[in-house]
Amino acid sequence: YSALEIKDDSYWANIERASQWDFNDMIAKAGKPGDKDEWLMTPQTVNAYYNPTTNEICFPAAILQAPFFDMNADDAMNYGAIGVVIGHEMTHGFDDQGRNYDKEGNLSDWWTAEDAALFTQRADRLAQQYSDIIVVDSVHANGRFTLGENIADQGGLMVAHLAYLNSLEGKETPAPIDGFTNEQRFYLGYANLWAQNIRPEEILRLTKIDPHSLGKWRVNAALRNIDAFYSAFDIKEGEPMYMLPADRVVIW
């Protein structure tokens, strides 16, 4: 950052110089191998990411706190929260964008034609499923725009749930807490991450610009495709969260 000059004369001028430095830094990297030691987020950022060009997942220190991770919470809640986030980022390596990169981070078509065709078939069904959602009034979600994140949400749920079940091998089933079984608490841990109460105007704005589905649908739409969720809450045909088995889509 030695070329970046910060002065006490003007806030706007500092922002302008910082933006110009950032632009120049990105341009200077063009045509060069990716720096696999570079982080794209600060330690203070409450978020996580997968970088396909370096084939790595990153979890800044700030995300290791409630509601994502709680030292005092039971394993089910933590697996359903930070566990799903970890699985989510892992799955990005195999979503509609990440699958185009090989293990070295090169843009390369490394899938067999058969695998690619089956993936596309399932992905198209999942995209349509989300596009059928009405977010407000007569406005629909954009399942194609949010496809990568929806695949990652589903993959994260599947991977984290499997990891949680593996952690219970040879142990007694945990006793219910607050009236909820351990299986139910796994999904409650996930749902708790995306609780959201926003105005219709914000719903419309996010639907246009955010590649993630709205919080409500990151939970409800994702879980309706997962058989284990039905078992955990004993969901029956005719109930709001029920979806016919033939209509459920699982990518991975």
Enumerate the language-model features and the residues they cover:
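Intrinsically disordered, low-complexity linker/terminal regions across diverse proteins
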Residues: Y1-W252
